[in-house]
Every structure is written in structure tokens, then in C-alpha cells.
């Protein structure tokens, strides 16, 4: 069974406009930015908001409704120096911390698993420049 395109111009135009409308709707329903290893390797955006500044700003913006605080909590690290954990023979093989962490995938909602790149507040506001309205999306 061969697939044929509609021959009449109004039907084809309607089909193309419908596909365009569906594509535009998909853009508005997702995150505005996606970060890949290349994005992260360039570092923070010159106008990006990162680290504690990002946590403080979201905390102030979301005060009436609150926000999900575990986005900003730092995992506790061991108190021993790194030399006690690393064999001296492996020093030339190991990656630096930033590069090694770039290979770890953050926990993502099931709906976004399997997509290329990562998304989230750090991607949107640190590695890219986010707007006031994008920040408000992280409030409860």
C-alpha cells in the first residue's frame, strides 16, 4: 500500500498549517532551554544566575507559595581529603570534578526521561539567561 499526498492545494495547505500549529504548541509546553555537555563545558552564561544567588532569588520570588527546596541542597561530602580515596597510580587517568559530574544524569521526571540533554533551573538560569517568568515556573 503506497502512501500518497493529497493532490488538492487546500488540503495540503491545511495539513501543513495543522502540523505547524502542533509544533508551536509543543514548544510552549516544555522547558525553554536544554543543556548538553557542550553547553555545560562553556560555563555559566555571562548574565546567568548560579549557585547561592539562584537559590536566594527563587526563595524570594516563591515566598508566598514556596518552592521545592531539594533542588538547591548540596549532598554531604566525606571530610577526608581526596588523596585518601584515590590511588596515586590513577591520578593521570581521572577526570576533574566538573568533567566527571557532566557525565552524571540528574533525576528527571518520567515524562522527560530519554530526551537529549538535561533541563532544569540550573540549565535555564545558570548556563543560559532566564526570565522572571521562567523563574516563577519553579514556584509551587
Swiss-Prot record:
- Family annotation (SUPFAM superfamilies): Insulin-like
The question of whether Disulfide bond is a record keyword is answered with yes
Q: Name the PROSITE patterns on file.
A: INSULIN (PS00262)
Pro-peptide region(s)? 64-110
Which UniProt keyword terms apply here? Carbohydrate metabolism, Cleavage on pair of basic residues, Disulfide bond, Gamma-carboxyglutamic acid, Glucose metabolism, Hormone, Secreted, Signal, Toxin
Q: Which residues form the signal peptide?
A: 1-29
- GO biological processes: glucose metabolic process
Record has Transmembrane as a keyword: no
Where, per UniProt, does this protein localize? Answer: Secreted
Q: What is its main location?
A: secreted
PTM 4-carboxyglutamate: at which residues?
A: 134
Gene Ontology molecular function: hormone activity; toxin activity
Q: List the disulfide bonds.
A: 35-123, 50-126, 62-139, 125-130
Against CDD domains, the record matches this protein to:
IlGF_insulin_bombyxin_like (cd04366)
Q: Identify the tissues in which this protein is expressed.
A: Expressed by the venom gland.
Q: Which GO terms describe its cellular component?
A: extracellular region
Its annotated function is as follows:
This venom insulin facilitates prey capture by rapidly inducing hypoglycemic shock. Intraperitoneal injection of this peptide into zebrafish lowers blood glucose with the same potency than human insulin. In vivo, when applied to water, this peptide reduces overall locomotor activity of zebrafish larvae, observed as a significant decrease in the percentage of time spent swimming and movement frequency.
Regarding protein family, the annotation reads: Belongs to the insulin family.
Subunit composition?
Heterodimer of A and B chains; disulfide-linked.
- What's the protein name? Con-Ins Im2
Q: Which organism is it from?
A: Conus imperialis
Amino acid at each position: 500500500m503506497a502512501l500518497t499526498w493529497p493532490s488538492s492545494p487546500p488540503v495540503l495547505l491545511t495539513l501543513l498549517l495543522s502540523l505547524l500549529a502542533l509544533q508551536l504548541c509543543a514548544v510552549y509546553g516544555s522547558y525553554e532551554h536544554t543543556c548538553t555537555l557542550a553547553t555545560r563545558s562553556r560555563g555559566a552564561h555571562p548574565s546567568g544566575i548560579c549557585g547561592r544567588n539562584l537559590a536566594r532569588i527563587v526563595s524570594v520570588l516563591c515566598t508566598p507559595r514556596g518552592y521545592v527546596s531539594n533542588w538547591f541542597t548540596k549532598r554531604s561530602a566525606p571530610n577526608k581529603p581526596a588523596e585518601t580515596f584515590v590511588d596515586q597510580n590513577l591520578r593521570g587517568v581521572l577526570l576533574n570534578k566538573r568533567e566527571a559530574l557532566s557525565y552524571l544524569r540528574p533525576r528527571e521526571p518520567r515524562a522527560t526521561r530519554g530526551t537529549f540533554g538535561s533541563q532544569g533551573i540550573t540549565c535555564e538560569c545558570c548556563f543560559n539567561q532566564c526570565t522572571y517568568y521562567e523563574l516563577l515556573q519553579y514556584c509551587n
